[in-house]
Amino acid sequence: MPIIIPENLPASNTLTGENIFVMHEARALSQDIRPLKILILNLMPQKIQTETQLLRLLGNTPLQVDVRLLHIESHESKNTSKEHLLRFYETFDDVKDEKFDGMIITGAPVETLEYEEVDYWEELKRIMEFSVTNVTSTLHICWGAQAGLYYHYGIPKHRLKKKMFGVFKHTLNKDGVKLLRGFDNEFYVPHSRHTEVLREDILKIPELKILSESEESGLYIVATKEAKQIFVMGHSEYDPGSLKWEYDRDSAKGMDIDVPKNYYPNDDPTKEPIVRWRSHANLLFSNWLNYYVYQETPYEHK
């Protein structure tokens, strides 16, 4: 089934070219189906790129998904035009009285700042509180996951000595968890971050459970017992070239950055990256939508 997106959203042509089923709003109104209402809070600088990555995954499921895009009002985006935001995005005031089946909170390149130093922290706190009462299940990604764990449970983040950068092998910690259905015993996920959340801090909170982790990159998936809040530390949504783009950008600036691990053949950045996380990403988002959004949400929100 398709994702429902606004006419002329830049991601539309890209996804259609990839054979992803996209439906525009006018056609969706003619169908007698209640689509899942999914809100994406996009905190990433390159918003069009992130939109496309997430819509690609949401559109590759049997469920019809009506996507709404949300941006932070208290922060001025320097990498996405005002015209794009005005045309395709809403603010929290626009949606605060609505109910949503699911919500995604993306990462953001602010992890070296203390949470309270982030200029939109107060607004983000209001949105995260809104997710408790107005959203069936919320999926937090990377810094969004760290921020969610800090806001909801007071769990701190810790600065890494060196950036966690590459594609790392992960294993499963739990059996019988619906979010993990169909996962291989070992699978790979990209990470790109300067901070981490410690295992011992999660274990202090009885409501939280560690579903997946990596010997090299640490925690990957943490969730509440009912999976109303899911915290994903990696970037399974990344394009094949996302880590390459980050590496090339930082190298061009003269920054001291290592080649992303397990990404290029023989760690040779002159070669094409090896994509080994795509099937995992599709399964993660499909399981979340099916088991924790679609199966748990009423036909009509009261």
Curated annotation (Swiss-Prot):
Residues where substrate binds: 163, 192, 249
Main location: cytoplasm
Catalytic activity: L-homoserine + acetyl-CoA = O-acetyl-L-homoserine + CoA
Pathway in which the depicted protein is active: Amino-acid biosynthesis; L-methionine biosynthesis via de novo pathway; O-acetyl-L-homoserine from L-homoserine: step 1/1
Localization terms from the record: Cytoplasm
Active site: 142 (acyl-thioester intermediate), 235 (proton acceptor), 237
The entry's keywords: Acyltransferase, Amino-acid biosynthesis, Cytoplasm, Methionine biosynthesis, Transferase
Protein name (database record): Homoserine O-acetyltransferase
The organism of origin for this protein: Clostridium novyi (strain NT)
Gene name in the database record: metAA
